[in-house]
C-alpha cells in the first residue's frame, strides 16, 4: 500500500546571503515523503533562486502531479531538475539503494573575513581544503585574500568560485596578486569568466586550474579532457535525478577529472542526503556542503555537530 505526504517550508537566512546580486532572505522548498509498506523515503525539492530555471511554485505543481501519479502506480520521473532530484532521493531511500554512509567533511566556506577561515582551518584534521567565493569584490582584493590564505597556511588547498563574474582583464588582475609559487595549491577555480573560451584562456595564461559548474547544465556541454580543466562541480538540485548525477560523476572520473558534489543551499535534510551521495559516488573527494550556517535552523534531520535548532516535521505546512 502506497502513501505520500508533501510539505512546504521556509527557513530564514542570515542577513548577508547574496545570490546573483539578489539578497536571499529565506530559503523556500518542499519535502516529499513516500511510504510503501513499512518503508519510507524522503526527498527535498528546493530550486535555487537565480540558478534554477524553475521556481518553487513551478516545482510544487510538478511534484504534486507526480505524487498523484506515483500513488496510482506510475514511477516515471519528472523532467524538472529539482523535482527529479528530490523524488529520486525519496525513491532511493524507499528502495534502500541510497547508502547510509555519509561524508560529513565539508570544505569550509569563506564568504567574508579570511581571519575566520584561518581559525576554522587551524582545527581541521587531515587534508586542509577550503572554498572561497571570488568575484563579489574587486579582483585585486580577491587576489590579495587568496594569496594571504595560501601564505598563512602552507598545507592549504583552495577551491575558488567566481560564478563567471570576471572579464579576461579582471581575471588577469586577480592572478597578478597570487604568488606563482602558490598557484598549484589552488585546487581549481570554478568558471572564472563569462564564456568558456575566456575561462580556458585564463587557465592557460595563469597556470591556475579551472573547473566547470554552470557549463554542465548548458545544452552544448560535453565531457572532454581539456588542458587546464581539473574538475567538475555537480550540484544535484540543479542537475536532475540521482541517475543523471551518477552519469556525470562517471563521465568525469573516466577523464581523470575530480568530481565534487556541491550544495545548492539545501536544508539540513537535503545536505545529509548530499553527504551520503558524496560518500557513495565520490568517496575520495571532500564535498562542497558547508552552507548550513547560512540558515537559522535545521529541519527534520540534523547535520552532525550543528548547534542550529531543529524544526520537526510537525511544524511544517502539509500540502498533501
Curated annotation (Swiss-Prot):
Per the entry, which co-factors are needed?
a divalent metal cation
Q: Which Pfam families match?
A: MenC_N, MR_MLE_C
Active-site residues annotated for this sequence: 133 (proton donor), 235 (proton acceptor)
State the function annotated in the UniProt record. Converts 2-succinyl-6-hydroxy-2,4-cyclohexadiene-1-carboxylate (SHCHC) to 2-succinylbenzoate (OSB).
The family annotation for this protein states: Belongs to the mandelate racemase/muconate lactonizing enzyme family. MenC type 1 subfamily.
Keyword annotations for this protein, in alphabetical order, are: Lyase, Magnesium, Menaquinone biosynthesis, Metal-binding
Q: Which InterPro entries does the entry link to?
A: Enolase-like_C_sf (IPR036849), Enolase-like_N (IPR029017), Enolase_C-like (IPR029065), Mandelate_racemase_C (IPR013342), OSB_synthase_MenC1 (IPR010196), OSBS_N (IPR041338)
The UniProt GO MF terms for this protein read:
magnesium ion binding; O-succinylbenzoate synthase activity
Organism encoding this protein:
Escherichia coli O6:K15:H31 (strain 536 / UPEC)
Tell me what this protein is called: o-succinylbenzoate synthase
Query: Is the keyword DNA repair assigned to this protein?
Result: no
Q: Which GO terms describe its biological process?
A: menaquinone biosynthetic process
SMART domains hit by this protein: MR_MLE
The reaction(s) annotated as catalysed by this protein in its Swiss-Prot or TrEMBL entry are: (1R,6R)-6-hydroxy-2-succinyl-cyclohexa-2,4-diene-1-carboxylate = 2-succinylbenzoate + H2O
Decide whether keyword ATP-binding is in the record. no
What CDD domains does the record point to? OSBS
